[in-house]
Curated annotation (Swiss-Prot):
Protein name: Histone-lysine N-methyltransferase CLF
Role description: Polycomb group (PcG) protein. Catalytic subunit of some PcG multiprotein complex, which methylates 'Lys-27' of histone H3, leading to transcriptional repression of the affected target genes, mainly abscisic acid (ABA) responsive elements. Required to regulate floral development by repressing the AGAMOUS homeotic gene in leaves, inflorescence stems and flowers. Together with ATX1, modulates AG nucleosome methylation statement. Regulates the antero-posterior organization of the endosperm, as well as the division and elongation rates of leaf cells.
Localization annotation: Nucleus
Origin superkingdom: Eukaryota
Organism lineage: Eukaryota, Viridiplantae, Streptophyta, Embryophyta, Tracheophyta
Amino acid sequence: MASEASPSSSATRSEPPKDSPAEERGPASKEVSEVIESLKKKLAADRCISIKKRIDENKKNLFAITQSFMRSSMERGGSCKDGSDLLVKRQRDSPGMKSGIDESNNNRYVEDGPASSGMVQGSSVPVKISLRPIKMPDIKRLSPYTTWVFLDRNQRMTEDQSVVGRRRIYYDQTGGEALICSDSEEEAIDDEEEKRDFLEPEDYIIRMTLEQLGLSDSVLAELASFLSRSTSEIKARHGVLMKEKEVSESGDNQAESSLLNKDMEGALDSFDNLFCRRCLVFDCRLHGCSQDLIFPAEKPAPWCPPVDENLTCGANCYKTLLKSGRFPGYGTIEGKTGTSSDGAGTKTTPTKFSSKLNGRKPKTFPSESASSNEKCALETSDSENGLQQDTNSDKVSSSPKVKGSGRRVGRKRNKNRVAERVPRKTQKRQKKTEASDSDSIASGSCSPSDAKHKDNEDATSSSQKHVKSGNSGKSRKNGTPAEVSNNSVKDDVPVCQSNEVASELDAPGSDESLRKEEFMGETVSRGRLATNKLWRPLEKSLFDKGVEIFGMNSCLIARNLLSGFKSCWEVFQYMTCSENKASFFGGDGLNPDGSSKFDINGNMVNNQVRRRSRFLRRRGKVRRLKYTWKSAAYHSIRKRITEKKDQPCRQFNPCNCKIACGKECPCLLNGTCCEKYCGCPKSCKNRFRGCHCAKSQCRSRQCPCFAADRECDPDVCRNCWVIGGDGSLGVPSQRGDNYECRNMKLLLKQQQRVLLGISDVSGWGAFLKNSVSKHEYLGEYTGELISHKEADKRGKIYDRENCSFLFNLNDQFVLDAYRKGDKLKFANHSPEPNCYAKVIMVAGDHRVGIFAKERILAGEELFYDYRYEPDRAPAWAKKPEAPGSKKDENVTPSVGRPKKLA
C-alpha cells in the first residue's frame, strides 16, 4: 500500500548524503544549523502573529453574527401575544390532535377505541373527531434516469475519466455491494511513492539559507536532512525560485519586449498548441491540443485587389506622402536642401527627388520606390562626376587656358571630399546593386517607350562610346564644356532623366546643388538603414507573412498584420529597401529555376494555377462525367465496399508529405485516402478528389462520396456548395433542387426534432416530432471517444445494469454515450427497426448518423438494430431462432464487451 511505502521512502530521503571530504566546501554544518534554526524561530514568531491577527478578525466576525441572531430572536419573541410560546401553540394545533389518531398505534385509525382527547380550535372542550383515511392512488414509479451531459459533437475522453487500472465498486439493485476486481495481475495498481509539494515555509528557508550561505554541497546536505528531502530536489527547487524571482522583478514591460524580440514561430507557440487547424477552434475537445503542425505544400497565390491611385488607407499612407513630398523622419526634401543663389541673385531649388517621387505610380514594383529613385539619383551624380572628371582632366592637359577650367578642378576636389564622406559599405552596396538598380530605373522611372529606347541604346552603347572617345578632341575644341558634359551624360543616364540632369548642370550654382543632393541622398539612405534596424524579429516575420498573403501591397499588410506596430509608410520604406528584396523572393518567393514568382505589380506569376474544368467552361452542355476508380486513392475504399464491408473503418491521421505521396506515405500504409488536411500537393494520386455529381443530389451509389460512406465536402467536390449565413439577412436564390447537394446533413447539422419520453419497450425512449420520409437524416449519435480497452472495462458495469451505450466507431475508437451524448442515445433496440445507423466520414472524422429506414410518422418511437455480435449480444438483443434450425458450432467466440455496430 502507499501508506506502508511512504515511511520507508521518507526515511531514505531523510538520510543525509555522505559527501566525500573533497566535496565538503563551504560553511560548517554548525553554522548552517544555526542559520536554519534562526529562520525556523522567525517563522514560528511570524506564525504566532498571523494566528493572533486571525483570531481577532474571527472575534469581530463572530460578534457581528451573534448580534444579528440575537436581534432576530427578540423580534420573534415580541410577535407573540400574552407571552404564549409558539412551540406549544403549534403542538396544540397539530393535525394528529384534531383527527384523534393514536400515534402509539403506528398512526392507524381505531374506530372502536376510546376517543382521544383533541382540542378543537376555538373550543376548550375535548371532542372526538371521526375521519376516515384517504388512500392515495398507486402511481407507477418512474424509470431510473442517469444524469448526462449533452454533446452536439463527439469529444475525446480525458485521462482522468479512464477506468483502466482502477477498481470499480458496483451497487446492485438489492442494495448490496459487489467489488469488481481486475482481470489480471498486470492491471493491479502500482504503489507509487507519494509526492510532496514544497510548502511556503520550506521555500522561505531554502531561499534565505542559500542567499546567506551560498550554494554548496554542505548547505544542500543540511537542508535536505532538515526538510527530509534529497539534495537534488532542494537544488531543483532553488532554481525554480530564482526563475520566479527574475520574472517578478522584470515586470510586464520586459515580458512584452521579449515577446516582440521573438520571431513569429516563437510568438505563436501557444497558438499552435491550443488552436486546432482542422476544426478552426481553440482547445478542441475532439483532436486535443499539441497537434502536429502540418502545412500544405501548395500555397495559394497572394490576394492582389485592384489598385486605386486615389484610394488611401490613412494619413500615413505612402500614396499621400509621396504626393505631398513630406516624409516622416526627415521632413520635406525641399526644406532640407534649401535654396542656392548665384552672384546675380537667381535662386534655384533642387527638385530632383521630389519630382521623381511625386511622379511615381502606385502600381509599380518595389524597385520603383523612393529608395530606388534616390539610389538612381546618387548613381546619376556619380556618373556625372566621373564623366566630368575625365573631361576636365583632358581639358586641363590639352588646353589649360580654357575658361572655367580652374572652377571645374575645384569641383572635382569637392566631389572627392563628398565621396569620402559617404560610408564605404554604402559604396560597396551600390556597386553590387548597380545592375539591378539600373534595370529598376529603366522600368520604374521611365515610361514604357523610354524603357524600350533605353534597351535599344544599351546594345549600341559600346560603339557610341568608342566614337565619342575618338572625337573627344574635336568636341573639346569646337563645343562648349556644358555641351561636352551633356553628351557624355546622355550615354549612361536614362533618356527620361537626361534633360533634367542637363538642366541642372547648366544652371548657375550647379556645383552647390549637386553637393546638397549628394548629402540629401546620403541622409535618406542612412535614415532608411536606421529604419530597417528598428524592425523587431516579430515584425519582420509578420511582414514576410503579409507579402505571402497580400503580395507587395503595403496598405493591406500594415492594416491587417502590422496594425499598432508599423504604419503604411514604414512598411513601404522597408519593402522598397534593396537589402530586403532578396528576402521577398527567397524561399517560397522563388520558382525552382530561380525566377521570381512576382511580376512588376507584385502579382504571382509562373505559378501552377489549377486549370479550369471543362465542365465549368462548357456551361451549355452537360457531358457524362467519367469519374475514375483506378487511382490508388479508391483502392482501399473499393476493396472495403466489395470484400470487407463489415470490417471497421480506419482512423484517419493526416500525412506531412511535401511531395506527391509514395509507397511510404502514412495514409497509404494505413489504408486511408489523403485528405485536404494533409501536407501533400493536390496532384497526389492517393488524395480523395471528391465527386462531380450534377443532378443526382449525391444520394445514390453513383456518387463516389456516397458509395464510400463519406459526406460531400464543398472544398473538394465540384458542384456541392453551401449557402452561408443563418437566413436572417435573406437567402440567395437557389439554382433548383437538381443542384442542391443532399449529402451534407451531418456537416450542416440539419437534424430532425427528437423528443424524450417513457418507452413502451424499456425505460426511456426517443420519439420523432415531425413526419419524415425514407432515408431521411434524423440526427447524430454523439458521445465520448474511448479506446477499445476502455470500452471493455466500462462494458462490465453496463452489462450488470442491462443497458448499453457503446457504439463501435472505427479500429481505434468507440463511442460511449453513457455520461455524455444526445437524445438519440435513448433509441431502443428492435429486431424490426424503423431506423438504421451508419458510420460516415465527415471532414476527416468518423461520425455516426441515424437515418429513417422507412416512412416514420410524427410521435412514433425510434428503433434501430444494435447489430451485436451473436456471441456477445445480451439475451434481450438476440434474435429468436427459427424452429428446426441448427446451432452453428464452428463460430469462434469474439473477445470484448458487446458494442453497437453500424
